Design a protein with these regions (language model features):
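N-terminal leader/linker segments that initiate helical-solenoid repeat arrays
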Residues: 25-103, 114-118, 138, 259-263, ...
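Solenoid-like repeat scaffolds
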Residues: 38-42, 72-79, 106-114, 141-149, ...
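Generic helix N-cap/helix-start motif at coil->alpha-helix transitions
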Residues: 43-51, 78-85, 112-121, 146-156, ...
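Residue-level recognition of tetratricopeptide repeat
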Residues: 56, 90, 125, 159, ...
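Position-specific recognition of the canonical hydrophobic site in helix A of tetratricopeptide repeat
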Residues: 59, 93, 128, 162, ...
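Residue-level detector of the short coil/turn that links helix A to helix B
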Residues: 62, 96, 131, 165, ...
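Alpha-helical repeat scaffolds
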Residues: 98-110, 133-145, 166-180, 201-211, ...
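TPR/TPR-like (Sel1-like) alpha-helical repeat modules
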Residues: 110, 144-148, 227-253, 260, ...
Length: 581
């Protein structure tokens, strides 16, 4: 899917047609005598239909911005159609433009808006933002919001009730449908309500309950609860909530900020949520679940509305950026990430995510600069690992090695080890001509995950390339291939291992399969060409080498491919075995 699929010329033509069709130009001297009012009306109808079809196509091709523009234009032609209003509002919110969605819903006839769930949701958020709480509550009671928004409606209703009558709000929270999938979120909501009421001990207990259950927003909830406890001098209680949030993973950004304050002996302020902030937090908590989490469009809709209520909720901005990435809208994702200031606890996460977005766009120099900015802001484990991978993929092996060393040493100090980080460092060591060190890391990783195909494949490859333990190496690769028979790079490993052993018929069999699985991998096509050459099929070998060259391989491989096309392979098979990332 690609955002912005409509070409400038198409947009211009559509705009010109729309201007003719829907402008206020009445028939006059400039209009041909044969152009009747009925024909103008038909043109308007055709334009409306064209806008509708174009918008639907934009939705199907993953371009919410174009979909929103064309649905809104179609709505302008038929402002009484609630179905069209709903589509226009959904697309506008999916594009991340809450303000435009609110304007659209606010300008619609009341009877149309009353039948459009997303328009009602936009109006509810606008009512809360503008302090029209009774109007918001009235809208929340309307059944038009539908099953998709039932949990959200319940959370917002509880919060708005609690703002005016905390005990009644808490009682209303008890009446929410008991659904196992949102039990953690419901406990967090009760914590918010009790904190708002000043019942801090009870609030902390419900935050504790929430963190003992599955909870998508656990870092934000834990940071809130830990800050509440620390502000009251209950340091051990704060650390307990932090420990519950971390589990087997390293601390998230919100919790890490509170933990740093505790370790430094700094005073932690009591969290304060006004009506808007609390509604935003309630909405954020429930929007990390189920279908909303799995759909980038729904996620963008919800988090755009959350940020309309609280633009400073950085965790929601990260979630919005993630939705944009999944919509294949890298520029929008970068803009959202860059809006998070360096002073935010979530700044380092925003920078390292921006680095990943830039790297995916092959803007590696900018990505590395952004990765360095993330490291300057935080040395959290997740930041170190992601920065290590970023540097590894871009050839800064010394930097990657240093970062992975730091993570592995810190893990060891806690009595832990992570096979993925060991594997990453092994690849760096191997590419730095330190096979002995790479082998040590691979053995350590296999001690943790003895059946992991990636590890079996890499170690087996390395042994065969070194010309020792060849049978053991082949056995490891065969185990990897049995576990992942549809992974082209592993089947390539198996074929290349047979090639190194001089078993060219078997090599061709596996390498042909690898090429079917990964037809755009120049390394696999290069290997297949070598196997064909050794198998006496020189013309087919040249064809594969040419195909590999067309795929624009890395410079070193391009040089060897050109040499092989010029001279073929030397008389004896080479002993070098290409490494794998």
């Amino acid at each position: 899917m690609r955002s912005g699929f409509l070409s400038p010329s198409f947009r211009a033509a559509a705009a010109a047609l729309s201007a003719l069709a829907v402008s206020g130009c009445a028939l006059g001297p400039a209009t041909p005598s044969w152009f009747s009012a009925e024909m103008l009306e038909e043109l308007r109808t055709q334009q409306e239909y064209a806008d509708f079809i174009t918008a639907r196509y934009a939705v199907m091709t993953g371009d919410p911005e174009s979909a929103a523009a064309y649905y809104r234009r179609a709505w302008t032609s038929s402002p009484g159609d609630p179905g069209l209003l709903e589509r226009a509002t959904i697309s506008t919110l999916a594009a991340g433009d809450a303000a435009a969605a609110i304007r659209l819903a606010r300008g619609a006839p009341a009877d149309a808006a009353d039948e459009a769930p997303s328009a009602q949701l936009a109006l509810i958020v606008d009512d809360i933002a503008e302090g029209r709480l009774k109007s918001a509550q009235s809208r929340l009671r309307k059944p038009v919001l539908g099953a998709l928004n039932v949990d959200l409606a319940g959370f917002l209703s509880v919060w708005l009730t609690a703002v005016e009558a905390p005990q009644r709000g808490f009682s209303e929270a008890d009446l929410l449908p008991g659904r196992r999938m949102v039990a953690g979120e419901q406990a967090a909501l009760k914590g918010l309500v009790l904190m708002q009421a000043g019942r801090d001990d009870e609030a902390a207990e419900f935050f504790r309950q929430a963190l003992r259950m599955p909870l998508a927003t656990r870092d934000a909830v834990a940071a809130l609860g830990a800050s509440l406890q620390a502000s009251r001098g209950k340091i051990e209680g704060a650390r307990e909530l932090i420990a519950l949030s971390v589990g087997e993973d390293a601390a998230g950004p919100g919790v890490a900020r509170v933990l740093a304050d505790l370790d430094a002996g700094r005073k932690v302020a009591r969290p304060k949520l006004d009506t808007r902030d609390g509604a935003a937090m309630a909405m954020f908590v429930i929007s990390g679940t189920g279908l909303v989490r799995s759909s980038p469009e729904l996620s963008a809709m919800r988090h755009a509305l959350v940020l309309h209520l609280d633009p400073d909720l950085a965790a929601a901005r990260l979630a919005l950026a993630d939705a944009y990435e999944r919509q294949d809208r890298p520029d929008a994702a970068l803009a959202a990430l860059q809006a998070i200031p360096d002073a935010s606890a979530w700044a380092a996460d925003a920078r390292i995510e921006a680095a990943a977005v830039l790297n995916a766009q092959e803007r590696s120099a900018e990505a590395l600069v952004m990765g360095d900015r993330a490291l300057a802001l935080s040395q959290r484990r997740e930041i170190l690992v992601r920065a290590g991978d970023l540097n590894r993929f871009n050839g800064r092996l010394d930097v990657a090695r240093r970062l992975f060393d730091q993570v592995i040493a810190a893990d060891a100090a806690r009595g832990q080890s992570d096979w993925m980080v060991l594997y990453a460092r092994a690849t760096v060591r191997n590419e730095s001509a330190d096979w002995a060190g790479a082998e040590d890391d691979l053995r350590a990783a296999l001690a943790i995950e003895p059946d992991r195909p990636e590890l079996l494949n890499y170690l087996g490859y390395g042994w065969i390339r070194q010309g020792k333990r060849i049978e053991e190496g082949l056995a490891l690769i065969m185990r990897a291939a049995e576990a992942r028979p549809d992974q082209g790079y592993i089947i390539d490993s198996l074929g290349w291992a047979h090639f190194q052993l001089g078993q060219y018929d078997k090599a061709i069999e596996h390498l042909e399969r690898a090429a079917e699985l990964s037809p755009t991998d120049p390394e696999i096509l290069d290997h297949l060409g070598d196997a064909y050459w050794r198998g006496g099929r020189q013309e087919e070998a040249r064809f594969e080498w040419l195909a590999a060259l067309d795929l624009k391989p890395e410079p070193a491989r391009e040089i060897t491919l050109r040499e092989k096309l010029d001279k073929g392979l030397p008389a004896m098979p080479g002993a070098r075995l290409a490494s794998r990332p």
